[in-house]
Structure formats: structure tokens, C-alpha cells
Amino acid sequence: ETIRDLAFGGVSTEDIIYELEKEGIIRGYKAVIDWDSFDDAYVSAIVELNVVPKADLGFEEVAEKVMSYHEVESVYLMSGSYDLNVVVKGKTLQDVARFVARELATIDSVTSTTTHFVMRRYKEMDVHLCDMEHDDRGQFLL
């Protein structure tokens, strides 16, 4: 059955959610936290990895290795000028830089890394994280 069939068949929302969870379509739930409002906020970075894919395995082996680190929040295979997009978090800029240098950059198939530190989060997982106000001149105040 499709979601539409369930919804139009008079099935409750709870039953639809249960079915989606059972089938593995809903993989989990997560709270969106505005870490910038905490004193003990963490630093996050987007790390671009260039990778030489392995025969018969492609990028999978490297992606699995990268995913195994607790500092890694997300991993995406990309089209374009680099291969893997890795979202990393740490307590400080130095922690993230050290992790990239000691762990990610030393993986066998990784040929280069480029790290971009997140300066501010405006929207995450479709949730607005900051209120943007206009001043009298029509400019944004943050």
C-alpha cells in the first residue's frame, strides 16, 4: 500500500507512521537545536574530500570509514569538483582541524581535503534558527 492509499482509506496517522517506521522509510527523529544560543556551543565544518575510488567498491569503503567517526554528522557523495561532502563537529576550531589532519586526510584513498568552517547557521532541517530584523535603512540586523 502507498501512503496515499492508507491516508484515503481512513487509516490513522499513528498507523501510517508505524507502517513507515516498520518499512524503514522513516529512519528516525531528531531535534533541531540552536547551538548558537548555548554558551557551550560546538564548531562545525564542511569538509570536501577528493577520493580515488576503489575497484569494485567505488566510494563505499571510504564513506563507511568516514561515517565511523563520532565527529562526523553527515556524509554525501557529490557531483562536481570533489567527491565526498563531510559535515564535522568539534569543541573548537583546533579540534576540527586536528581531526581533519589526523583522521580524514590520512585515509588511504583520500587525495585532498578542503575545510570550510560554519560561521553562522540561518536555517537547518527546514527550521529558521535566527530572527532577522530590518533597521531603518532597510538593512538586515542579526
Per-segment meaning from a language model:
Residues E1-L142:
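A compositional/biophysical signature of low hydrophobicity enriched in polar/charged and small residues
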